[in-house]
């Protein structure tokens, strides 16, 4: 894994022999990002200057929210085929952009004051149609701190998913329904009681949803929901769900994407760089690779998220088990 160091990996032999594995890849070392972060900062301390909020985040989010809600209003009398087409080829990009804006805000990368980021996250959530921004932050920060840890990292598929999704047809359905699995996984595996801010998130979202239906009709609301659903399934933008941590190389558990869709996704494709430095906003992650390139050049990466989806579905050795897992270390 380049200068980040190699991991000790244990997995069944099936995947290496051309058959889908029957268990996860189990690692007996810590996740690679903390150690690589220390190494890079010792060599390039100037990277600390990249830490901090993106001053343009508020403006970018506001423009996308206004554009998407305006589009929903314009489509209030449109036919269903037109609504579905615009949702897939236009609205999906906007709502997925907002989902990844919420990801950015979960790291407090719009404002220095956390509560301002939380409020902006609730605002960014509006066109998505389903309240999720506050809950997402609670689980996502654990994904960083406990990457791959059994029972804590909710980004890793469940054993039920892995047992059921074992062929091309099942993987195709799984990709279509990715958002549902991401949403339901924490409820069954690691439920957390909702807090004050989640109720605020829920209340504001319901007010917006009801207002859209009352003022513009169900078709406008359906456009927003469809934009969320299709953008999180069989869609180029959704390729990052698979590309980030699904193991195509048993010696690497995080992968970056260096393609054009980074322009629309807050550079979430720079995923090794993001996990190494979660305090650096997306608009500066490319500078990490430019400054400390030798730490990333030896790592496998992607240039097409659509190709990643195709590889995941068609490769008979890859499935939900193709994830790195580890037990909780005593130091945690």
From Swiss-Prot:
Expression by tissue: Specifically expressed in flowers.
GO cellular component, one term: endoplasmic reticulum membrane
Motif (Histidine box-1): 103-107
Enzyme class, UniProt record, top EC level: oxidoreductase
Principal cellular location given in the protein's record: endoplasmic reticulum
Subcellular location: Endoplasmic reticulum membrane
Disruption phenotype: No visible phenotype under normal growth conditions.
Positions of transmembrane segments: 55-75, 83-103, 119-139, 164-184, 197-217, 222-242
Catalytic reaction annotation: an N-acylsphinganine + 2 Fe(II)-[cytochrome b5] + O2 + 2 H(+) = an N-acylsphing-4-enine + 2 Fe(III)-[cytochrome b5] + 2 H2O
Keywords, in A-Z order: Endoplasmic reticulum, Lipid metabolism, Membrane, Oxidoreductase, Sphingolipid metabolism, Transmembrane, Transmembrane helix
Name assigned to this protein: Sphingolipid delta(4)-desaturase DES1-like
């Amino acid at each position: 894994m380049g200068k980040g160091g190699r991991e000790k990996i244990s997995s069944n032999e099936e995947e290496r022999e051309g058959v889908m594995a029957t268990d996860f890849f189990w690692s007996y070392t810590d996740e690679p990002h903390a150690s690589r972060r220390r190494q890079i900062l010792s060599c390039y301390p100037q990277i600390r200057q990249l830490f901090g909020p993106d001053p343009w985040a508020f403006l970018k989010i506001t423009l996308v929210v206004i554009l998407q809600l305006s589009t929903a209003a314009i489509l209030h009398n449109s036919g269903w085929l037109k609504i579905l087409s615009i949702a897939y080829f236009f609205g999906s990009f906007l709502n997925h952009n907002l989902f990844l804006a919420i990801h950015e805000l979960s790291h407090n990368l719009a404002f220095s004051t956390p509560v301002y980021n939380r409020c902006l996250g609730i605002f960014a959530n509006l066109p998505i149609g389903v309240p999720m921004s506050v809950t997402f932050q609670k689980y996502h920060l654990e994904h960083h701190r406990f990457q791959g840890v059994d029972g804590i990292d909710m980004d890793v598929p469940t054993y039920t998913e892995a047992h059921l999704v074992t062929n091309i047809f099942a993987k195709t359905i799984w990709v279509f329904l990715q958002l549902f699995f991401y949403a339901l996984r924490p409820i069954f595996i690691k439920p957390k009681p909702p807090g004050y801010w989640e109720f605020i998130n829920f209340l504001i979202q319901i007010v917006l949803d009801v207002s859209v239906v009352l003022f513009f009709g169900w078709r406008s609301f359906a456009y927003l929901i469809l934009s969320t659903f299709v953008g999180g399934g069989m869609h180029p933008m959704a390729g990052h769900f698979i590309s980030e941590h699904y193991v195509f190389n048993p010696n690497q558990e995080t992968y970056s994407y260096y393609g054009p869709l980074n322009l629309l996704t807050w550079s979430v494709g720079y995923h090794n760089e993001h996990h190494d430095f979660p305090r650096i906003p997306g608009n500066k992650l490319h500078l990490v690779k430019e400054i400390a390139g030798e730490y990333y050049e030896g790592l496998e990466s992607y240039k097409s998220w659509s190709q990643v989806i195709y590889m995941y579905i068609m490769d008979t050795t890859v499935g939900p088990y193709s994830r790195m897992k580890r037990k909780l270390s005593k130091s945690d």
